[in-house]
Amino acid sequence: CGLFDEEYEDADGGEFNFELLTEHPFDCLNQELDVFVNVFGIYVISHSSIPTEYVEHSANVLAEFMDNDADGVMDDPEVHRFLVENNFVVPVWTKALREEVFPSLRGTFCEDNLGWAASMYYGNDDWAFGGIKQAGTWDTNLEEIWHVVSVGWYNTYPEYFGDRTGSRLADAMDAARGGHFLTVPNSYPEGAWYTYDDYTCDYSCQMHEYFYWILMANIDALDPAYTNKCADSEDEWYVCTKDELQQIDPLAYDLLNNQGFKLPTRIPSGSYRGLSGRETS
């Protein structure tokens, strides 16, 4: 089927299967990497030294973010189109492997024609196999893979989600921080509920983190009933549930729920169910 066909079905009309591939269509990625998963035209890229269950879990989380209701249709075709046309990739690797890959891309097509936003690091990041509700631990995939997917949202709907001053997302973040701070302030105003203090994180970077936090709260991924993530993050963000988001951050709640956008509403668990309702992991 074509890259932008509405539905993704295999020849039998069943679920979309995420096959582990040994080559990427861009040969420049094949020099140091040898495991790839095509998730609706967006590639998870990895290496055979990484256990396959980690790669497959990340691929399934990506699929769940793109088709959260698992009906086989991209939740937002324009966000999907942006990510595919700009060749975004989701690396699952180690820092040592990363240091081998990037030099191999210099002077090749891949150097300037791939989309990079975030990575999953085997041995450092956390995978919650079976999902956070079952595992009882946080899944770093929920953050890092959303950082990739969200680039499509920033660029497709700049008035609403643009990662710069003036968008609705920026206005909501300014309210959450207690003011418009282009750089991290020495201290946040009393009453602020988004208080990220990484001085290397500029305004757009602060927005990326904020978009992640409000989405996680909105899908109840931070609910203390599941993991300790919200309590562990209270020095940066303490809004744990959709109900709390509505009460504490009404601008974010309205943006996510009342403006007609089809954002994720279910917590990705690493088990994309596709068209048939069967898990692919």
Q: Model regions: which residues?
A:
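Pan-zinc metallopeptidase signature
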Residues: 211-281
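Generic detection of long, well-ordered alpha-helical segments
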Residues: 48-56, 202, 242-246
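Post-HExxH zinc-binding segment in Zn-dependent metallohydrolases
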Residues: 153-227, 233-237
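Start-of-domain marker
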Residues: 17, 21-30, 39
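Short amphipathic alpha-helical surface micro-motifs
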Residues: 25-28, 70-74, 193-195
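Intrinsically disordered, low-structural-confidence terminal and linker regions
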Residues: 1-17
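Acidic/His-rich structured neighborhood in mature extracellular/periplasmic domains
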Residues: 32, 39-185
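Sequence contexts marking disulfide-bonded cysteines in secreted/extracellular proteins
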Residues: 2, 27-29, 109-111, 231
